Each structure stands twice: as C-alpha cells, then as structure tokens.
Amino acid sequence: MNNNIFSEITPDIIRLAAKSEAADIIDTELFTKYDVKRGLRDLNGKGVLAGLTHISDVRATEMIDGVSHPAHGRLFYRGYDVKDLVNGFTKDNRFGFEEVAYLLLFDELPNKKELEDFRALLSKYRSLPTGFVRDIIMKAPSQDMMNTLARSVLTLYSYDDRADDVSLPNVLRQCLQLISLFPMLSIYGYQAYCHYHDGKSLFIHRPDPDLSMSENILHILRPDSQYTPLEAKLLDIALVLHMEHGGGNNSSFTTHVVTSSLTDTYSVIAAAIGSLKGPRHGGANIKVVKMFEEMKQEVHDWTDAQEVSTYLKKLLHKEAFDHAGLIYGVGHAIYSKSDPRAVIFKSFVEKLSVEKHLEKEFALYSLVENLAPKIIAEERQMYKGVSINVDFYSGFVYQMLGLPMELYTPIFAIARIVGWSAHRMEELANNGKIIRPAYRPISEDLSYVEMEKRR
C-alpha cells in the first residue's frame, strides 16, 4: 500500500480516468478508412518517409529483378559498413567510441592527429560544474536512472551562459560536452541512489583523462576502478553498435521534432532521453536478461533442445515469464534475416563468457538463438524471416560486466547521444520547417449548452 499522498490514485481519479478513456477511444476502422499510417508505418511495418539523412543507413532488403526481397541486415555510418569499422579499430587494438563519434558528427574518419585532438577535447569537457554533484545529483536521488539523467541534463541549462544559442558552433559545443558528461551523470546518479536508499558506501571517482570512454565508465563505476582489457573492449564495441540507427527510431525522430522548434540543446536531449526510457524503445535488453533468468530456473537441462523449445513455446502461448506472448530479443521492426549488430557482437560475447567462466550460459543463449526464429515462424505462421536483435546479447554482456540493471538503459543513452547530436546538427544545418504532421478530427460539431441545461 502506497502511503505517499502525492502518488495516491483516489476513487475520483479512477472515475475521471474511465470517463477520459471512454471519450478518447477511436474506432480502429477509422484509421483504415482515412489511410492513417499508425506509428508512421505502413501495413508491412515500413516507416513512412519523413526526412532525408546523411548520417546512417539501415538496410534489410535487396532488389532482385526489380522485386524487393529480405536480405541479411547491414548498418552503415556515414557510408561505412559498421562491420568494417569494428573490424578496423579492433584489428589495430584501438578503442572505437571516439573514432566513430567523430565520423558520425563530421562525416569523415579522423586521421591520427584529428583523433588525438578530438579525444583531448572530449577529455577537456569531462568535468561537471563546481558543486554540481553535491547540489544536484546528491539531492533527492531518483529510483529511475533515466529520470535522474534527464533532470541533470535540464539542470545543466542553468550553468550555460549560451544555453539558448542555436548557432551550429554553440550547439556542437553543447553536444560534445553532453557526450563527455553522460557517463558521470548516469553513474553518479546511480551511486547516489544506492547510498541514500540502500545504505551502500559512496565512491565517487573522477574520470581519468588518459582513458577511453568505455574504460572511464568501468573506472568510475567500480569501487576499485579495476577492469580487464577484454571487458573494456567489449563495452566499447557495445557503445559503437548502439550509437546510431537512422533518423526514424523513436528517440532520434524525437530529436528532429523537438530541434525543429528551435528550442535549446538541453531540452532536446532531455526529450530524447524520455523517449529512450520507454519500454518499447530502450528497455528491451532488461527484459531479455529477466526472461533468461526465469528460463534457467524452469529448464533443467540447458543443452536439451526439446526442453528449451517447450519453454519458448510457453512464452509465445503467454504461459511463462511476463505472459506477454513474446520471446524478447528476437525480431526487429526492420531487420528480418539478421541484425548486423547482433552478428558482430556474438563472437566478442563468446570470448567474454570464457573469461567469466559463463560458457554454459553462452551456450544456452546460442541454443535459443537457433531455436526461437523457427518456433516463432511455426507458431505465428510468419513468412517474413525473424532473427535475434542486438538486445539479445547486450543484456548478457552487461550482466557479465557486472553493470547494475538500473544502468542498462543509461548505457544505451551514453552511446546514442552521439547519434542524437548528429541528427540535431543535421536538422539545424538544413534550416527546415517545424515538424507538424496532420491529425484528422473525427468529432461532430456541437452547439454550446447553457449550465442549467446540462445533464
């Protein structure tokens, strides 16, 4: 029973909510009648064309004899295949976050000098205003880390003398500062909550200017600041793979929409955070981890394909886990035959599972990866291919890295703010109109009713 009066849902509120719902329901046939693209997607799930972008390209089909066919997914950042980018920096034993961020923001791969200068600039910006941790982050810590992150971002507005300046140089400066600060805002917020609500010891580590983004995340998160090279490498790859995914995903489109009003950078990024927080967007890997935790309890032999298949069918029949009828981490709005991010991720995930002595868990994930698409196709009579998506393995990776579940979505935000920044810059550079789609009214015109005549 919640005794917080602020959060109380009274009988009056329940009554009024029912009244509101009854007034707001729209007959689903009307959406078809007026050819409304619900979710801005057509009947096949393809997004309507709402804009153009240089930043990235998500491909899942190929043309054969003039006909579009499903193909293995590919993801391009500024024209470069992400697979080639990851192979490039891992082969040379470099961290990729800063290099790929430079590419997304400036449309070219940096040379050695440009990369060194860019890393130095991000390091320079990796410092919060004096007293910010004490006065903002430590005060009234929230149980939700995405809300904490959004609040911190909005509060930074008051520390910026040029907060409302939307000139490109100023917006770039703001975006680079936020990219640099996101790990601190996220992790310090989590540590403050654990200290005040769970009584845990408080460790506040300053970022190390000589470390990469992924190394700094592990450095400031862990009490002893220790991590292995493989841990840092895999987190770096995870950040790169989550950095950008087209202008039509919900948070990037939110960035375009809010930017088009010419509001400030802090408001735009806070809006994008709010979008990413939603369970339909940024929280899928948490569902995957929780689903597997139950699976490991319910399935006695993790190597038995028949027993695992039986559990997966229970998921689809709404007889297991959250009874939603979903196998989390399988399927994607665009990709069908394969998600390139998951394909890239898998080989590195296996290496970390060996280092962490979690080979049996990895084998279970691999078995589900092989079984789930076939079972979904059979049970749902789907003719479009289905495969695992990047969320399938990312939660397992974060679990192996010892990242608290409360930080899974903020880690996503730490990566995706690079894409948001690139889309904000692109929207401003093209000086487009304010985004304002149409909504068709379907209510009847009514005559005003005097008070004494109302029912």
Residues covered by each model-derived region:
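Non-transmembrane, aqueous-exposed alpha-helical and coiled segments at domain scale
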Residues: 1-455
